[in-house]
């Protein structure tokens, strides 16, 4: 009962936050113009696991500087100050005056997963990986066996440092990345590189279909730190768009779980799928909109082994204050094939400016 009062008090306090202007500040600096914006996400997370901590914390505190030198050269610098630490997120220079072909150099998201490529300012699932504090045991990646947990910890998705190309023509768009493979703000550990590619076809104004391929290089310590490569591939579909009625994102991915090797250093095969459906209804008055949502996720870290997969069901509700500024709650329900069901209740406020 005490936790319920905390949840309700926090949610009501979030809804009392005044509207926030979303126009970015534009300034001039030397030979460039700079637009400054940012986001601040404050979260409360409570787990059903007995020895887990229930925690208030700042999930994201990011300032974004979008820099324009001319029609050919743009850049972004995005530091994150969450939890009292400084970590660079997007930091890149982008070259190109045509939407058909552009080159990025720096740190950015790999060209792979639809949920990772979707901004946290748009997503209404509070945590992509549906983490439940106090739960572990997913083969190779620890934590829970969920869609984003697998592809993030196996480094097929998330940010990395390197080179990216992207573009679009008609109904087709593409992006490809060549990166270190070690992740955000980390130097390379070998001479190998990781590759990712993604192609999207806009079947209609509201429906898009995509296919993606990722090749990740890693070190095998038991083989003298020799370099090997894991491969993952998948397809996804998106119906609708953000904050406009029905919106659905669904994906299926299969590949090598290189963090789970057998005695001959062969990778296990993982399989994961996820669908997130939401419906945004515009409102008048204090609230700009209301959005209920539902996530279904399955993660199997080793398809050759029985009863080691897990499922996630996440009902949620978001209250929009203005634009992308919102507050809401998710209940992540994790059910492993072997073990007890665990819950994580999360409330988060999203400030976008």
Q: What kind of feature is each model-predicted range?
A:
Residues 1, 17, 127, 328-330:
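Intrinsically disordered, low-complexity peptide-like regions
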Residues 25-184, 189-196, 200-209, 274-282, ...:
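Outer membrane beta-barrel
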Residues 1-8:
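Bacterial N-terminal signal peptides that target proteins for export
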Residues 48-51, 70, 94-96, 104-107, ...:
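Outer-membrane beta-barrel pore domains
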Residues 17-23:
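Sec/Tat signal peptide C-region and signal peptidase I cleavage site
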């Amino acid at each position: 009962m005490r936790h319920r009062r905390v949840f309700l008090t926090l949610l009501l306090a979030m809804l009392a936050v005044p509207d926030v202007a979303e126009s970015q500040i534009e300034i001039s600096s030397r030979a460039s113009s700079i637009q400054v914006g940012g986001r601040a996400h404050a979260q409360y997370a409570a787990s059903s696991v007995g020895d887990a901590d229930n925690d208030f914390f700042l999930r994201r505190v990011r300032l974004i500087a979008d820099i324009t030198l001319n029609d050919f050269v743009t850049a972004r610098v995005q530091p994150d100050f969450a939890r009292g630490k400084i970590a660079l997120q997007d930091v890149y220079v982008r070259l190109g005056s045509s939407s058909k072909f552009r080159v990025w150099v720096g740190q950015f998201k790999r060209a792979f997963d639809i949920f990772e490529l979707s901004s946290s300012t748009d997503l209404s699932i509070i945590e992509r990986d549906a983490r439940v504090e106090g739960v572990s045991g997913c083969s190779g990646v620890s934590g829970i066996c969920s869609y984003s947990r697998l592809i993030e910890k196996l480094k097929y998705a998330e940010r990395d440092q390197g080179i990216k190309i992207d573009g679009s023509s008609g109904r087709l768009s593409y992006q490809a990345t060549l990166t270190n493979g070690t992740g955000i703000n980390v130097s390379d550990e070998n001479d190998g590189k990781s590759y990712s590619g993604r192609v999207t076809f806009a079947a209609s104004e509201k429906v898009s279909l995509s296919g993606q391929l990722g090749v990740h290089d890693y070190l095998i310590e038991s083989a003298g730190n020799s370099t090997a490569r894991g491969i993952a591939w998948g397809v996804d579909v998106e119906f609708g768009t953000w904050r406009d009625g029905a919106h659905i994102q669904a994906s299926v991915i299969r590949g090598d779980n290189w963090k789970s090797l057998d005695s001959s250093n062969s990778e296990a095969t993982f399989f994961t799928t996820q669908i997130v459906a939401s419906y945004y209804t515009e409102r008048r008055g204090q609230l700009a909109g209301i959005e209920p949502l539902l996530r279904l996720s399955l993660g199997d870290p080793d398809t050759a082994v029985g009863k080691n997969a897990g499922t996630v069901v996440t009902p949620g509700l978001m209250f929009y204050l203005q634009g992308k500024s919102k507050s809401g709650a998710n209940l992540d329900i994790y059910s492993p094939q072997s073990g007890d069901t665990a819950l994580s209740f999360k409330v988060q406020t999203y400030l976008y400016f």
